[in-house]
Curated annotation (Swiss-Prot):
Keywords: NAD, Oxidoreductase, Tricarboxylic acid cycle. Gene3D superfamilies: Lactate dehydrogenase/glycoside hydrolase, family 4, C-terminal, NAD(P)-binding Rossmann-like Domain. It comes from Salmonella typhi. This is Malate dehydrogenase. Homodimer. Catalyzes the reversible oxidation of malate to oxaloacetate. Its EC number is 1.1.1.37. NAD(+) binds at G7, A8, A9, G10, G11, I12, G13, D34, N94, I117, T118, N119, M227. GO terms for biological process: malate metabolic process; tricarboxylic acid cycle. The keyword Oxidoreductase applies. PROSITE patterns: MDH. Belongs to the LDH/MDH superfamily. MDH type 1 family. GO terms for cellular component: cytoplasm.
Length: 312
């Protein structure tokens, strides 16, 4: 199993690479790519960790050597948020970066499962899909927007509020990956209930958690370590499913049946070919249903922005 991390010299990329070096199954290969010249050195640094995961780093304009034979590609390349920016302010820079890298994936490892971490995810996933489609290699079961950070934040905040162990809580999060499009299904957590006010306040905190980190870092960056953890969890789940493990379920932002929007985050059963089944989002509370209805315009506009970036 070969996993490639694109954007591996950045804050998310380094955290992700460290976790993968420690947690990928023995015999796996990990390849790191970034435009920054430090990348081969990051790989050398990580290569001293005593796990049976082969690691190699590549830098420069050409990601091809890193992508050859990859089963899973995780893209975290791009610029980070600064205070006062929202995820859509990143669009102008990051759209071009994602387009370029996905074009290289289409040429070099078109059958790989691709997880997009680069924000704004609502839009960058649509860009990736259109690039792959133009190249004639798009498989909607193999392209994912990584929204796992919303899930792990939800698990943490719910556990804090309700005095539970974070490992015992699993909150499904649907919709998209920014602002109002993030919708934690708090009504679906077994054995936990919320007042309407609690649900509204907690939902808002989960939606704004990224901004909480950006402001706390006072201009020094955005959520890199928790995002690295989230991306590693998703990447490792994907690897386990590709290797034939049954019953692996994760939420991610994928192209579905278009009931809500062309791309939508929902629980997925993962398998040997990527998405095996898009699972139902279940019964929503009145608050959740209202939030879902209210977000769809925003989500559809975000998606349209990505489609237009490639097709206009």
């Amino acid at each position: 199993m070969k996993v490639a991390v694109l954007g591996a010299a950045g804050g998310i990329g380094q955290a992700l690479a460290l976790l993968l070096k420690n947690q990928l199954p023995s015999g796996s290969e990990l390849s790191l790519y970034d435009i920054a010249p430090v990348t081969p050195g990051v790989a050398v640094d990580l290569s001293h960790i005593p796990t049976a995961v082969k690691i190699k780093g590549f830098s420069g304009e050409d990601a091809t050597p890193a992508l050859e034979g990859a089963d899973v590609v995780l893209i975290s390349a791009g610029v980070a948020r600064k205070p006062g920016m929202d995820r859509s302010d990143l669009f102008n820079v990051n759209a071009g970066i994602v387009k370029n890298l996905v074009q290289q994936i289409a040429k070099t490892c078109p059958k790989a499962c691709v997880g997009i971490i680069t924000n704004p995810v609502n839009t960058t996933v649509a860009i990736a899909a259109e690039v792959l489609k133009k190249a004639g290699v798009y498989d909607k079961n193999k392209l994912f927007g990584v929204t796992t950070l919303d899930i792990i934040r939800s698990n943490t905040f719910v556990a804090e509020l309700k005095g539970k162990l974070p490992t015992e809580v699993e909150v499904p999060v649907i919709g998209g990956h920014s602002g109002v499009t993030i919708l934690p299904l708090l009504s679906q957590i077994p054995g936990v209930s919320f007042t309407e006010q609690e649900a509204a306040e907690l939902t808002k905190r989960i939606q704004n958690a990224g901004t909480e980190v950006v402001e706390a870092k006072a201009g020094g960056g955005s959520a890199t370590l928790s995002m690295g953890q989230a991306a590693a969890r998703f990447g490792l789940s994907l690897v386990r499913a590709l290797q034939g493990e049954k019953g692996v379920v994760e939420c991610a932002y994928v192209e579905g049946d278009g009931q809500y929007a062309r791309f939508f985050s929902q629980p997925l059963l993962l398998g040997k070919n990527g998405v095996e089944e898009r699972k139902s989002i279940g019964t929503l509370s009145t608050f959740e249903q209202h939030s879902l209805d209210a977000m769809l315009d925003t989500l559809k506009k975000d998606i349209q922005l990505g489609e237009d970036f490639i097709n206009k």
